[in-house]
């Protein structure tokens, strides 16, 4: 994260502006603190990674899932690639393509004020979607990708992916909680989340936060587990789905939890086990 990026951040507690106090290297945050000009709270930055969340608010399934992801971060993506076709009879690539198209990345245009286009992935994990973002963007478009996650283990894997050139070059990573996104209102041109909201302790709050930080009119895309009503699973597939959704008895789309003013709502299955929920927040369409 660069020093000038701090202007896009907001205090997770009060949404006040943050000010950087610390060391920077090549204009990048290194070691120090982000201090809120409103409530005075400070947030640590270690090894260039901002930690903008409260540990005492990470509880229940949020804490459990973080523990799981931190324990096996290097195995997550390889297992997903192997198990998706085994469990669902559809490739991982086809499933990801099914929801990435809903982001309409190809329609993004330059901002008249010269600011880069900004894309946020809530729960970026090891960054499996980053190559697809890069491939879908219009050539030459200045874009920043922001990825946040509660798992430092997964973020470390994401950083390795970026160093290998498998993503968008201008990417920022930070540790944050989806229930209190550390960004100013209407910051991002695209916002999406894949594979975690079903385990959040307050999914409605997370949905409101995603809507808050999205620019009016932009598509927001949320993906997680839900058995396709038209799918006829085998006993093996039923057992696999139950294992994947061990954290809840009702794995389903949170459509009923969307903000009251959500519009253009589309709910669809992108694979036998995963739904894709697309919606927009009120306002004129974002064209540049």
Spans of features found by a protein language model:
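N-terminal auxiliary segments of SAM/dcSAM-dependent transferases
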Residues: 1-67
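Conserved class I S-adenosyl-L-methionine
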Residues: 7, 53-113, 128-132, 136, ...
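Class I SAM-dependent methyltransferase SAM/SAH-binding core
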Residues: 118-180
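Short beta->alpha hinge that forms the Motif I/post-I loop of the SAM-binding pocket
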Residues: 150, 202, 225
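A short acidic, Gly/Pro-enriched loop at the edge of an enzyme's catalytic core
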Residues: 179-191
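A short SAM/SAH-binding and catalytic strip from SAM-dependent methyltransferases
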Residues: 190-202
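A short glycine-rich, Lys/Arg-flanked "PGG" loop and its adjoining helix->strand segment in the class I
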Residues: 204-216
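C-terminal alpha-helical "lid/dimerization" subdomain adjacent to the S-adenosyl-L-methionine
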Residues: 221-278
